[in-house]
C-alpha cells in the first residue's frame, strides 16, 4: 500500500479523492442547516467545520496505532443517515441536544468498539461481496439525479445537463481506453476539470460564491452553545452511529480486498474506535457523525493507487479548506451534472468490485445464491422505494431507512441460518 509518487502526483491524487466526496460532504450541512433555521453565518460555520472534521476524521483512520486507526486508504465524511434524526432532534429539543446526542453516541462507540470488532465472523465473502454490491447500487440513483442537474433543479433533465453529464462519463472512459499509468489514475480528476471547463462555456459555472467567501474560519468548541442530553435523542443518534458502522464495515472489507490485506477482529476494533472518536469530535465542534465514504473505494479501484499517503493528502486538503472558506467555495463551482457523470463511473466500480469479491464464493451453493439474491433485492428495494417503511417510527425508522442496513442484515441473517442447517458447508471455492 505504499507506492512511491512525487509530491505533485500525490497532490493530484489526493485532490481527486477530495473532489469525489466533496458534494456529499457539503450537502448534509446545507440540508440540516436550512431545516433547523440557521442564519448565513451559522451555515458558513457548519460547512467549514464539517470539511475540517472530514479531514481530521480521515487522518484518524489512517493513523494506525495500538488503540485506533484501521490504516486503510479510507476517506470519512458526514453520514446521510443522520440528516433526518438531526432535524427531528433539533426541532424537538433544540440544536444543543443534537450535539449532546452526537457526543454521547461517539463516546459509546469508542467504549464498545471491542464488542463491535468481534462481529467480524459474521462477514464472510458471500456477505461482504453482497454488502459492497448493495452499497454501489444504492448510490446509483444519486449519480443519475446529479447527472440530470440535481433533485429540485429548475433545469432537471434538460438536454444540456444530460449531454454534459454523459460527456464527462464518456471522457473518463476514453482516458482509460487510450492512456495508461498516471493519466489513467487521475482520470476522474481530469474528467471533472474538462467537464467544468465545458460547463463554463455553456454558462453553467458561477464564481460569485468564491468572491464572497471569507479567507479564514477558526473552529470553535460548542459553537452553538453547551450541549444538552436527552435520552430519546441519544438513543436515536446511537442507532445512526450503528448504521454508519455497518456501512463502514462494507467499505473496510472492500478496501482490504483491494489492498490484499486480511482484516482481523483487532483491525475492525481500531477502525470502529477511530470512527467513534470522529463522531465524538464532531459533536464537540458542532459538526456531524462520520462514516467511511464508499465513492472513494471506486477511485482506489479505478486508479490502482492504494497508498495511504494519497488519502493523507486528501485529509490535509480537507482540513485546509475547512480553515479557508474561499478555497472551499472554489470547489463548489463544479456543476452538478459534471459530478453526476463522474459518479456513474465511480459508483459502477463499487458494484463491479462487489461482484469481484463474490467470485471467490461457491456459486454452485443454492444457499449462497439465495443470500446474494435476497440481500441485494431487499437492499435495492429499500433504496428505490423509501416510502416502503414510512409507517415505522423511532428506532425502526432509522434502521429501515437505509437500504444498506436492510441488505446487510439480510445477508448476515441468511448466512447464519444456512450455516446452522449445514454447518460444514463452505462459502469459498476450493
UniProtKB/Swiss-Prot annotation:
The keyword tRNA-binding does not apply. Keywords: Cell membrane, Membrane, Transmembrane, Transmembrane helix, Transport. InterPro entries: NCS2 (IPR006043), UacT-like (IPR017588), Xan_ur_permease (IPR006042). It holds the Pfam family Xan_ur_permease. Signal peptide: none annotated. One of its GO terms (molecular function) is xanthine transmembrane transporter activity. Coiled coil: none annotated. One of its GO terms (cellular component) is plasma membrane. It comes from the Bacteria. It is found in: Cell membrane. GO terms for biological process: xanthine transport. The keyword Coiled coil does not apply. Uptake of uric acid. This is Uric acid permease PucK. The gene is pucK.
